[in-house]
Regions:
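Sensor-1/coupling segment of RecA-like P-loop NTPase cores
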Residues: 124-147
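Conserved AAA+ ATPase core "coupling" helix
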Residues: 164-180
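Residues immediately C-terminal
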Residues: 111-112
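Short basic/glycine-enriched coil/helix segment immediately N-terminal to the Walker B
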Residues: 92-102
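A short acidic, amphipathic alpha-helical/loop segment
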Residues: 42, 115-123, 147
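Walker B catalytic acidic pair
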Residues: 108
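Conserved P-loop
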Residues: 19-94, 139-150, 160-163, 185, ...
C-alpha cells in the first residue's frame, strides 16, 4: 500500500527564500485619491537605490499620453502598455529576461481581466518578483471592476488609499457626470475621460446623486 504523500517543511533554499518574499499588492481607492502619485513615488524609491522597475498601464488610457503614467500633481513616467488580451506573465517574464527588475508596478489595475490578475499572481509565485497594483475598487454604478474583484480575492496585501467626500467623510464611491452636470446611471464601464467627469463621494451622497438601487 502506497504511503500518503507529504509536504516538505524543510527550510527553503536561497531561491525559495526569494520567491517567498515576493507578494502581490493591491492599492485601491476612488477617483482622485493620488494612486498614480503613490505608484510613481514607489518606483522612484527603487530607482533612487539603484534598482530597476517595470511600469505597466492600460493601452487605452492616454490621459497623460500613450505609454505614460501621470499624476495630477504634474509628475509622470514612461510605462509599457497592455491590452486585455495580453499575457501579463509572458510580458513580465520577457522583461526579467532583459535584466534585473526589483518590482513591477501596474496602474489602472481595474482594467485587467480576471485571467490577467491570475497571471500576475503566477509571476509573483514563480518568478519571485513583487507586483504592486493601483486601481479603482468600484465603478460609477457601484459595481466591482473585474480586475479589482480578482485582486481583492488574490492579493497578498491590500491597502485602501483614502480620499474624502465634499461632506468630509471618507469617499468610497464615484459618480460619472454627464454634460448637464447630473450623475449618470447608465453607460459603458470602460470609458476613459477627464478627471472632471468623475466625483468621489461617500455612500450617503452617492445614493443621493444616483438614487437607490
Amino acid at each position: 500500500m502506497r504511503a500518503p504523500s507529504t509536504v516538505s517543511l524543510a527550510p527553503p533554499g536561497r531561491l525559495g527564500q526569494i520567491l517567498l518574499m515576493a507578494k502581490l499588492y493591491f492599492n485601491y481607492s476612488t477617483m482622485n485619491a493620488g494612486k498614480s502619485t503613490l505608484l510613481l513615488q514607489a518606483s522612484y524609491n527603487y530607482i533612487e537605490r539603484g534598482m530597476q522597475t517595470y511600469l505597466l498601464t492600460a493601452n487605452f488610457d492616454d490621459r497623460a499620453g500613450k505609454g505614460q503614467i501621470g499624476s495630477r500633481i504634474g509628475i509622470s513616467a514612461e510605462a509599457d502598455t497592455y491590452t486585455q488580451t495580453d499575457d501579463l506573465f509572458a510580458k513580465i517574464a520577457a522583461r526579467l529576461a532583459e535584466g534585473p527588475c526589483a518590482c513591477v508596478l501596474v496602474d489602472e489595475a481595474q482594467w485587467m481581466t480576471k485571467d490577467q490578475v491570475w497571471q500576475l499572481a503566477r509571476a509573483v509565485d514563480d518568478l519571485g518578483v513583487p507586483i504592486m497594483c493601483y486601481g479603482l475598487r468600484v465603478d460609477f454604478q457601484g459595481e466591482l471592476f473585474p480586475g479589482s474583484a480578482a485582486l481583492l480575492a488574490l492579493a497578498d496585501e491590500m491597502r485602501e488609499v483614502r480620499t474624502i467626500c465634499h461632506c468630509g467623510k471618507k469617499a468610497t464611491m464615484v459618480i460619472r457626470v454627464g454634460a448637464d452636470g447630473k450623475a449618470l446611471r447608465e453607460g459603458a464601464q470602460i470609458e476613459v475621460g477627464g478627471n472632471d467627469r468623475y466625483v468621489s463621494l461617500c455612500r450617503v451622497h452617492w445614493r443621493e446623486a444616483v438614487g437607490d438601487h
